[in-house]
Amino acid sequence: VVGGDECNINEHRSLVAIFVSTEFDCGGDLINVEWVLTAAHCTLCAGIPEGGLDTCGGDSGGPLICDGKPDGITS
């Protein structure tokens, strides 16, 4: 933000902080009760440790499966 003003946290109740474990990762805006809008650089790059299979580039998105269960959506 360039030229912004400080504000009280209670003035903008739709802002969210996204944490990975206990580390702040990114911010976003709550656009309804289930969805957060965030910047493209805040997206998840899911894959296998060995490499070669991932959603990091050239993928059109789809379900994110963790431990055999649906856990989200990649884009």
Curated annotation (Swiss-Prot):
Disulfide feature: C26-C42
Example of a GO cellular component annotation carried by this entry: secretory granule
Domain Peptidase S1: 1-75
Location of the active site: H41, S60
EC number: 3.4.21.-
InterPro entries: Peptidase_S1_PA, Peptidase_S1_PA_chymotrypsin, Trypsin_dom, TRYPSIN_HIS, TRYPSIN_SER
Compartments reported by the entry: Secreted
Tissue: Expressed by the venom gland.
SUPFAM superfamilies (alphabetical): Trypsin-like serine proteases
Subunit structure: Monomer.
Function noted in UniProt: Thrombin-like snake venom serine protease. Clots fibrinogen (FGA and FGB) very slowly, releasing fibrinopeptide A and a small amount of fibrinopeptide B.
Family: Belongs to the peptidase S1 family. Snake venom subfamily.
Name of the protein this chain belongs to: Thrombin-like enzyme catroxobin-1
Organism: Crotalus atrox (Western diamondback rattlesnake)
Lineage of producing organism: Eukaryota, Metazoa, Chordata, Craniata, Vertebrata
